[in-house]
Swiss-Prot record:
Its main location: membrane. SUPFAM superfamilies: F1F0 ATP synthase subunit A. The gene is atpB. Belongs to the ATPase A chain family. GO terms for molecular function: proton-transporting ATP synthase activity, rotational mechanism. It comes from Prochlorococcus marinus (strain MIT 9312). It comes from the Bacteria. NCBIfam families: ATP_synt_6_or_A. GO terms for cellular component: plasma membrane-derived thylakoid membrane; proton-transporting ATP synthase complex. The keyword Ion transport applies. This is ATP synthase subunit a. Key component of the proton channel; it plays a direct role in the translocation of protons across the membrane. The keyword Ion transport applies.
Amino acid sequence: MLFNSLLTNFAALEVGQHLYWQIGNIRLHGQVFLTSWILLGALLVFISLGTKKMENDPKGLQNLLEFLWDYIRDLARTQIGEKVYRDWMPFIGTLFLFVFVSNWGGALIPWRLIKLPSGELGAPTADINTTIALALLVSLSYFYAGLSNKGWRYFEYYVHPTPIMLPFKILEDFTKPLSLSFRLFGNILADELVVGVLVFLVPLILPIPVMFLGLFTSAIQALIFATLAAYYIGEAVEEHH
């Protein structure tokens, strides 16, 4: 009986128990919207508090926000280049903050143990639809960056240095969003499931070090995603691209 009970509870943590919203003929993953709104709301409160009383000598939350701004600026400048990095800072910063907050929400909050009438909650980035959408957004962005800076000359990249490279470079355009999306999805989902299982088995002590490890890996994954997005954009706008 105990073994069967354990199996039942573990099964409740597996992928696929979504909270669906039906809008006409479209079925949406409601848990992604709910958790995204909660986490983005918390982020907006954090930013509002940090920018409420701006001072020349920053302290507390303002100091942290300015550190994040400087970090994103340096990341964009390094990967994209001095010429156009300012145009892409809002995009890279938004990507980084959304992925970072979503990842940390998954590491800190055992969403899957929150009982709902149907389905289950989860970190937005633990849903493959979210990570694929983010990756496709990155792909559209670097295409736009290349075309807006070079015009039709951008497509010379596909046959440089030889036309033989054409199929391989087209394939690369498909593998970039796939690697971005599955890397982020796999890491965050695995961390969320491990924390959920450990909270169920040993609810007080054991999950804590795993949660700290999850916070670290979640931050690294957000950094990797934003860095690769900036790198792809920088690659598209380079003159020798």
